[in-house]
Structure formats: C-alpha cells, structure tokens
Design a protein with these regions (language model features):
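A short alpha-helical cap/connector motif
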Residues: 1-127, 134-155, 159-195
Length: 195
C-alpha cells in the first residue's frame, strides 16, 4: 500500500470501531478472501459520512455489501444508497447482509455491469464511491461525473493499488476530450485567457 504511515495512523485514530454486525461481516469477508475496503478507507468513509451527510449515495462495486452498510450505518442523516454489482456469486450474499442488518429499505442493489447500468441512471447523487475493477475507473468517469451533483463528493478506492497508478496517457486523453476532468488545468487556462 502506498500511503504515508503518519496519515494512516491519523485516519485510524479517528475510528472507534464498528457495530457488532459490521465487525462480524468484516471478519467473514477476510476469512473468505472477499475484497473489502481497508481499515483506513473505512475510517475515511465514516468521517466523510459525518462531515458531508449525503442523502443519495452511489456505490460502484458492492461485493458482499460491507461498504454500503458502513456508509448507511455511520451517516447521521437518513440516506438512500444505490449499489452496483456484477459478480453473480456475491449478489445474494450482499442482499442477505442488507436484510440481516435491517437496511434493505435504504440500500438498493442493481445487478449487472456498471458500464451498462450507469448510463441508465438519471437522478444526481451527493456522494459516489467507486470500488470496482480499478482498470475500469477511467471508463466509468464520464458517467460518474454526469451523475455527481454539483458540490458532491467522488471517492475512488485503491487508485494507487499495489504501486500501480492510473495510466497517465489514458488520463491525459480524457483531459483532452473534456478539460473539466483536469480542473486545475481548466482553471489555469481561464486565468491566462483573462489576462
């Protein structure tokens, strides 16, 4: 993992643990080698739920439902979560976990490929969490940004996974297509045009 250890220590110091259900779900997921977010991302998500209090959340990549349940549990505001999962074996497990946690009314699971589902969604989201196939993030980005409410938050897990970074050429190509993907460059261009 590529993270400053001081940052990890700080983020983890904010965390006071999980509910008993989430602790058990995390333990089972790790034992079954199901990929779920690391502790520091769990702490960060909990912090963001309290700070941003999003009412509509989109999650791309459900697995067994751990992250969706964590966001639902630690958001102090009532929220609706739509989560997308493509792996058929995990879908019934996630649905069962939502039911066991009593959150099936707040969390809706859409079954299928996010590349096909995202274009069908129309209502904006306050918060979007991408935790799917990392190689697809750039392909999802145009639709994800279309769905992100103005002032909303986009969080993508494992951008620096195991030392691999988003392909800079692919990112540059996206910036050429739409400068808003590279906000800092677009702002710089506007300033230089004003002079």
């Amino acid at each position: 993992m590529i993270v400053d250890e001081r940052m990890v220590t700080f983020i983890n110091s904010l965390d006071e643990g999980h509910t008993e259900f989430l602790e058990q779900l995390e333990k089972e997921a790790r034992e079954d080698a199901v990929p779920i977010v690391r502790r520091e991302m769990q702490s960060f998500l909990k912090f963001l739920m309290v700070a941003a209090r999003p009412k509509r959340i989109l999650e791309v990549g459900t697995a067994v439902g751990f992250s969706a349940l964590l966001m639902c549990e630690y958001n102090p505001e009532p929220c609706q979560i739509i989560t997308i999962e493509n792996y058929e074996k995990r879908i019934p497990i996630a649905l069962d976990n939502f039911k066991k946690a009593g959150k099936e009314e707040q969390i809706e699971l859409l079954e299928g490929d996010a590349a096909e589902i995202l274009p069908t969604l129309t209502e904006p989201f306050d918060f979007i969490f991408m935790d799917a196939a990392k190689g697809q993030y750039l392909h999802f980005l145009p639709e994800v940004l279309r769905l992100l409410k103005s002032g909303g938050l986009l969080v993508s897990d494992n951008i620096l996974q195991e030392g691999d970074l988003i392909e800079i050429d692919d990112f540059s190509e996206l910036c050429d297509l739409d400068p808003s993907y590279c906000g800092y460059e677009a702002q710089g261009q506007e300033k230089s045009e004003e002079k």
